[in-house]
Amino acid sequence: MAGKSPEEEHPVKTYGLAAHDSSGVLSPFKFSRRATLEDDVRFKVLYCGICHTDLHFAKNEWGISTYPLVPGHEIVGEVTEVGGKVTKVKVGDKVGVGCLVGPCRTCDNCRADLDNYCPKMVLTYASPNVDGTITYGGYSNEMVCNEHFIVRFPENLPLDGGAPLLCAGITVYSPMKYYGFAKPGSHIAVNGLGGLGHVAVKFAKAMGAKVTVISTSEGKKDDALNRLGADAFLLSSNPEALQAATGTFDGILNTISAKHAIIPLLGLLKSHGKLVLLGAPPEPLDLHSAPLLMGRKMVAGSSIGGLKETQEMLDFAGKHNITADIELISADNINTALERLAKGDVRYRFVLDVAKTLKAP
């Protein structure tokens, strides 16, 4: 017997914003999602954060995009329907979906709650799904996914400011917990004060760490110290300041995705210090062994987090009232926002107001 067609697999008509080629320009787009399965949650999308990854995918800058492409993996909304076996949430609950909608849940990583390192992971958009179709993201009026990949939003956490935590928040929270350097009595640095960096400062301070922001821009100093509550600011273009900070930090979260030198950062670490890379510059790193040998230092990496840890992160954010600093934008202004994002003209995250501004084509 022949399998179901894509139209039969995905009978629910919906709409969103899609890129159709590597220009990255988004336009209204009609498509379909699957019917609600017994372990699925369907929800109305209220807000969706705009991540720099969305821009990379829309423009096919990593060479793996498939079109049409509906971006968005910082998705929050209100549950409208649940399958008969769903126990995690109910209709009316506020929920979120981050970067993943389909790890295998059987491999060693999945069994260890490391869904984010599953070799068979299904991304929230532009990824082959188990039914052979391509996933579409949260720049759309509704979502449906297995309840395993749903996280619950704390009641006190604003949905718009909380949306970017589903990518930016877990991206900085996970390495702080795993590498153990954000805790009372520790001194960490956040290199780069953008979408990731500003959230990293908030989480690290809430964990009790002393925090220094490192930036190439003197203009970020006031925000770092007075808006975000960092303890110190280090201008990385000032050799004297860097020399004075030698051996200062237990750990450095390196949030920068552009090409930059990392060897000077290693000199800022204490012995046994850890430099954790969160950005992915397109060029290889220039790294020598000597700075690592002298002090038993480590260069490591981290990518988002598993579903269990993402829920833990949201609960922590709710307890400490942590949200991203956002600029809310309408669907009509999505391409302008992406252009500004490419230029770094955002303080600090764009969030798409889906429910109020996204109209059916």
Curated annotation (Swiss-Prot):
Binds 2 Zn(2+) ions per subunit. CDD domains: CAD1. InterPro entries: ADH-like_C (IPR013149), ADH-like_N (IPR013154), ADH_Zn_CS (IPR002328), CAD-like (IPR047109), GroES-like_sf (IPR011032), NAD(P)-bd_dom_sf (IPR036291), PKS_ER (IPR020843). NAD(+) binds at residues 53, 192-197, 221, 278-280, 356. Pfam families: ADH_N, ADH_zinc_N. SUPFAM superfamilies: GroES-like, NAD(P)-binding Rossmann-fold domains. Its EC number is 1.3.1.-. PROSITE patterns: ADH_ZINC. It comes from the Eukaryota. Zn(2+) 2 binds at residues 104, 107, 110, 118. One of its GO terms (biological process) is alkaloid metabolic process. An alcohol binds at residues 53, 73. GO terms for molecular function: oxidoreductase activity, acting on the CH-OH group of donors, NAD or NADP as acceptor; zinc ion binding. Keywords: Metal-binding, NAD, Oxidoreductase, Zinc. Zn(2+) 1 binds at residues 51, 53, 73, 167. Its cofactor is Zn(2+). It is an enzyme of class 1 (oxidoreductase). PANTHER family: ALDEHYDE REDUCTASE. Belongs to the zinc-containing alcohol dehydrogenase family. Class-III subfamily. Homodimer. This is Alcohol dehydrogenase 9. The gene is ADH9.
